[in-house]
Amino acid sequence: MDINLFDFHLPEELIAQVPLEERETSRLMVLDRETGDIEHKHFTDILSYLHEGDCLVLNETKVMPARLHGVKEDTGAHIEVLLLKQEEGDKWETLVKPAKRVKEGTVISFGEGKLKATCTGTADQGGRQLEFSYDGIFYEILDELGEMPLPPYIKETLEDRDRYQTVYAKEIGSAAAPTAGLHFTEELLEKLKQKGVELAFITLHVGLGTFRPVSADTIEEHHMHAEYYHMSEETAALLNRVKENGGRIITVGTTSTRTLETIATDHDGKLCAASGWTDIFMYPGYEFKAIDGLITNFHLPKSTLIMLVSAFANRDNVLHAYNEAVKEKYRFFSFGDAMFVASHAKMGNK
């Protein structure tokens, strides 16, 4: 399948550069995955579309301030490091810029020596294995010295780093935020609970592969990056109870979707406690096994994320919805507006 089938025209001014002042004031497009019907709403209207007995699945990963600026100890040359994945102990898989300056044995100093890293291995596309040394607690030092690793299409400085975290972020480990969750406030989540909507939490640590473009000409040639996920016994039991009682499982974001669909795929359609690495790739033709609805932001043209949404709601429906979003001047990408995709015609809104 040609990746150009997932292209659409997006004016640059529709790429949201900063978050809205209030999280829940973003707009919400409601898309019926079967009929393609569209409604234009505000995010707080999600209350009308979720019902008692439904369950929202939220990714409680927390973004690390994973971008570090340091200097080479021998020359003083500036080096930028992006933490991707913790390996064993203090060894990390990272991206460095400029990569040609960092070879095995290179020592980089951050924060006037508060944190040091030695290159212990090299990989393609600027990848480097670094081993860190420090006094104290690594994540406290990272919190002091690191910056939030905003996506490459965001050029503005983020004034408040909490705005690139969900209000329920808990498990540190992501290089990017699960952005569909950024629209929820604690008050909105409380109102949903009062209505009888269940909240379930999983963890998937988002990797930088999220922003890597599909370089192959056809979808089938593309290989997904692997990301770590975890679902507890408590969450699995809740989701199975919701299903047994006829409720809907609504994932908040593509990361929650990938987690549930990975587990269901690996366990004959069943949801159970599990953890591991997933490189699941969902595109048209994929049959969903776990979810009934999806809340997600508006994604990049030709990205694996728009392919996932197209697998769930039909490519023609999704591209029509995206073209409507452009016409109606919705805000796109990480700090943009949201879409709620489900079989709304069957449920109506209450």
Swiss-Prot record:
Reaction(s) catalysed (UniProt annotation): 7-aminomethyl-7-carbaguanosine(34) in tRNA + S-adenosyl-L-methionine = epoxyqueuosine(34) in tRNA + adenine + L-methionine + 2 H(+)
A Gene Ontology biological process term: queuosine biosynthetic process
Keyword Cytoplasm appears in the UniProt entry: yes
Subcellular location, record wording: Cytoplasm
Keywords: Cytoplasm, Queuosine biosynthesis, S-adenosyl-L-methionine, Transferase
InterPro entries recorded: QueA, QueA_dom1, QueA_dom2, QueA_sf
Coiled coil: none
An example Gene Ontology CC term for this record: cytoplasm
Subunit and interaction comment: Monomer.
Function per UniProt: Transfers and isomerizes the ribose moiety from AdoMet to the 7-aminomethyl group of 7-deazaguanine (preQ1-tRNA) to give epoxyqueuosine (oQ-tRNA).
Name of this protein: S-adenosylmethionine:tRNA ribosyltransferase-isomerase
The organism of origin for this protein: Bacillus anthracis
Name of the gene this protein is made from: queA
